[in-house]
UniProtKB/Swiss-Prot annotation:
Stored Pfam families: BPD_transp_1
Bilayer topology term: Multi-pass membrane protein
Keyword annotations of the record: Cell inner membrane, Cell membrane, Membrane, Transmembrane, Transmembrane helix, Transport
Family designation: Belongs to the binding-protein-dependent transport system permease family.
GO cellular component: plasma membrane
Name this polypeptide is given: Putative 2-aminoethylphosphonate transport system permease protein PhnU
């Protein structure tokens, strides 16, 4: 007579769940909980009820519309400038090496580690009203007023952001350009292809993933940049981060500040979603 022993159920392994629980607790504490407080404060009206009263108040404000347009304009032109300048400099450093090119590459890497206010401080010393350039021009040509005054305008903010964020385009782009097979470039040159055609048909397709990655990062950072605009003190240039600061710190209107911050978060997520959509359409892995 044979005995049929019941199969023992394997013991439930809780270790993977514990490893998953720890990062979830960290995210909930450092991200989701503060975000939920911002959302609650933004949606709570003056009467204490949850609604869209503050949202309608913010959207109808001309100051908010101007800040939104300024934010998008600065982000677009700064990102375009970073892509253009970063592409040109990367092509030169990778394909046209010259004495000192390695040093320049290391300086570019160092720029990433520098705080943004340090770059704007250097801009103030060079292009400011009492800076080196204006001081030299006023002493040479006897100008009564500083002839160079673009720094305290939107153009100055865009130029400063291009200087700060261009290395974020150059680092992945230079790494991608170094992976291109040099034999393809030599074959194209032997066949008489124009350098612009070589760039468009050989180099650009290989560099597209790096360009999109660097460009999307620049777009997100310039959209949320606060220190450069604040430190330069550009006249009439109000952005969404600056408006959050002024509403919360200067006016103590925390409800409106939280609503603008929430809109800024949605804007950033929307821009990132557009990047992911464009990356999937072009076959770029992100």
């Amino acid at each position: 007579m044979s005995l049929i022993l019941p199969l023992e159920k394997p013991a439930l392994n809780l270790r993977p769940l514990l490893w998953l629980l720890l990062p979830l607790l960290v995210l909930a504490t450092l991200f989701f909980w503060p975000l939920s407080l911002i959302v609650e404060q933004a949606l709570r009206g003056a009467n204490g009820e949850i609604g869209l009263e503050t949202f309608r108040q913010v959207v109808d404000s001309k100051r908010f519309v101007g800040a939104l347009l300024n934010t998008l304009q600065i982000a677009f032109f700064a990102t375009a400038g970073c892509l253009l300048l970063g592409s040109v400099m990367s092509l030169i450093l990778v394909f046209i090496p010259f004495p000192g090119s390695e040093l320049i590459g290391r300086v570019v890497d160092t720029f990433i580690a520098l705080p943004t206010f340090l770059i704007t401080l250097a801009f103030t010393f060079i292009y400011g009203s009492a800076g080196l350039l204006n001081g030299t021009l006023m002493s040479l040509f006897a100008f009564e007023l500083p002839p160079v005054d673009f720094l305290y305008s939107m153009q100055g903010v865009i130029l400063a952001e291009i200087t700060v964020f261009t290395p974020l385009v150059m680092r992945p782009l230079m790494a991608a350009l170094r992976q291109i097979d040099k034999s393809q470039l030599e074959a194209a040159s032997i066949l008489g292809a124009h350098p612009l055609r070589v760039i468009g048909q050989v180099i650009f397709p290989a560099a597209l993933p790096a360009l999109m990655a660097g460009g999307s990062l620049c777009l997100l950072l310039t959209t949320n940049e606060f220190g450069i605009v604040l430190f330069i003190g550009a006249k009439g240039v109000n952005t969404l981060p600056m408006m959050v600061y002024s509403k919360a710190i200067l006016e103590s209107d925390y409800t409106v500040a939280c609503m603008i911050a929430l809109i800024n978060i949605v804007l950033s997520l929307g821009l990132f979603s557009l990047y992911r959509l464009a990356a999937s359409r072009t076959g770029v892995r992100s």
